[in-house]
């Protein structure tokens, strides 16, 4: 989540630490955990499984954001295996999506630990290590006033008060003090460029995530 005034939280989908690609434990995943249906279209990556937690099948998730409220709020997680090069004759179940219902979850020393139905022992929890955690956008908690989820800002057109199109939001940067919109644009010479616009009240005039429009006090020549 990002807040337009302070912007202290990192965007939800910006990885802080990447998994190191360690081989997973040789534990076949139960068929009941594998997800064969088409994945929901509104899935958002919110973290990855860093380790097993305890001996009763709990998993430890490293969130991609300081604010883990969306991860804690969702009761169903999709666990997708990251691309891994060099695996020969790997267990096919490793690559299949896993869908789990979360019985309980809580924050723990900068991580989120969770108990997933169907994951009953440490060996099975370790077999999930490295998988990315995805949840549906529809399962995010409602943001506070003047707060926005970064995923809702991506793809918004950005224009100024004069009606001049500045570009389209392609990403966000957290400089520690506030968020900065990365706005993809076309330069006068026809080449692709980028504008960096602080996501703060001094420059923001309106944000319409439903209409995918942002209006800012910003000139074409800035």
From Swiss-Prot:
A single Gene Ontology molecular function, please?
ribosome binding
Which InterPro entries does the UniProt record give?
A: PRC_barrel-like_sf (IPR011033), PRC_RimM (IPR056792), RimM (IPR011961), RimM_N (IPR002676), RimM_N_sf (IPR036976), Transl_B-barrel_sf (IPR009000)
List each copy of the PRC barrel domain by range: 145-222
Which compartments does it reside in?
Answer: Cytoplasm
Task: Identify one Gene Ontology CC term for this UniProt entry.
Answer: ribosome
SUPFAM superfamilies for this protein: PRC-barrel domain, Translation proteins
Example GO BP? rRNA processing
Coiled coil stretches, renumbered: none
The record, for Pfam families, names: PRC_RimM, RimM
Name the segments for region: Disordered: 1-22
Q: Give the UniProt keywords, A-Z.
A: Chaperone, Cytoplasm, Ribosome biogenesis, rRNA processing
Similarity comment:
Belongs to the RimM family.
Q: What does this protein do?
A: An accessory protein needed during the final step in the assembly of 30S ribosomal subunit, possibly for assembly of the head region. Essential for efficient processing of 16S rRNA. May be needed both before and after RbfA during the maturation of 16S rRNA. It has affinity for free ribosomal 30S subunits but not for 70S ribosomes.
Domain comment from the record reads as follows: The PRC barrel domain binds ribosomal protein uS19.
Q: Which HAMAP family match?
A: Ribosome_mat_RimM
Oligomer and partners: Binds ribosomal protein uS19.
Protein name according to UniProt: Ribosome maturation factor RimM
Question: Which organism was this protein described from?
Answer: Cupriavidus necator (strain ATCC 17699 / DSM 428 / KCTC 22496 / NCIMB 10442 / H16 / Stanier 337)
């Amino acid at each position: 989540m990002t807040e337009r005034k302070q912007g202290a939280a990192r965007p939800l989908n910006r990885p802080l630490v990447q998994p190191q690609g360690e081989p997973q434990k040789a534990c076949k995943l139960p068929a009941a955990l594998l997800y064969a249906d088409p994945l929901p279209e509104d899935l958002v990556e919110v973290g990855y499984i860093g380790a097993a937690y305890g001996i009763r099948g709990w998993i430890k998730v490293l969130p991609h954001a300081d604010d883990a409220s969306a991860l804690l709020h969702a009761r169903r997680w999709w666990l997708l295996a990251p691309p891994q090069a060099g695996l020969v004759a790997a267990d096919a179940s490793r690559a299949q999506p896993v869908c789990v219902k979360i019985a309980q979850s809580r924050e723990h020393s900068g991580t989120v630990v969770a108990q997933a139905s169907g994951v009953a022992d440490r060996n099975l929890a370790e077999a999930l290590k490295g998988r990315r955690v995805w949840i549906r956008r529809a399962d995010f908690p409602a943001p506070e006033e003047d707060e926005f989820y970064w995923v809702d800002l991506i793809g918004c057109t950005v224009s100024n008060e004069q009606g001049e199109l500045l570009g389209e939001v392609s990403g966000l940067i957290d400089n520690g003090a506030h968020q900065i919109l990365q706005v993809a644009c076309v330069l006068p010479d026809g080449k692709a460029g980028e504008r960096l616009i602080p996501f703060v009240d001094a420059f923001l005039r309106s944000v319409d995530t439903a209409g995918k429009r942002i209006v800012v006090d910003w000139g074409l020549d800035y």
